């Protein structure tokens, strides 16, 4: 997921994407705690993707406020 693709989405789509990423992050952390997670890089990727979505949401909010 890159920022260019995210900028093309609507605010509602971004909020849905953020909710999905938070669920995914929770599931990955739960798997890590129970010892089932094999690819620990997924936690970092989910966290960074959530940060990207939040950044784009803030950019859109700032643009709408102007």
Swiss-Prot record:
Lineage per the UniProt record: Bacteria, Pseudomonadati, Pseudomonadota, Alphaproteobacteria, Rhodobacterales
NCBIfam families: L29
Gene that this polypeptide is encoded by: rpmC
Protein name: Large ribosomal subunit protein uL29
Annotated disulfide bonds: none
Organism listed in the record: Ruegeria sp. (strain TM1040)
UniProt record similarity statement: Belongs to the universal ribosomal protein uL29 family.
Keywords in alphabetical order: Ribonucleoprotein, Ribosomal protein
Pfam families tied to this protein: Ribosomal_L29
The keyword Ribosomal protein appears for this protein: yes
GO CC annotation: cytosolic large ribosomal subunit
Taxonomy, superkingdom: Bacteria
InterPro entries, A to Z: Ribosomal_protein_uL29, Ribosomal_uL29, Ribosomal_uL29_sf
A GO BP annotation: translation
Coiled coil regions, renumbered to chain: none
Gene Ontology molecular function: structural constituent of ribosome
Transmembrane segments: none
Ribosomal protein in keyword set: yes
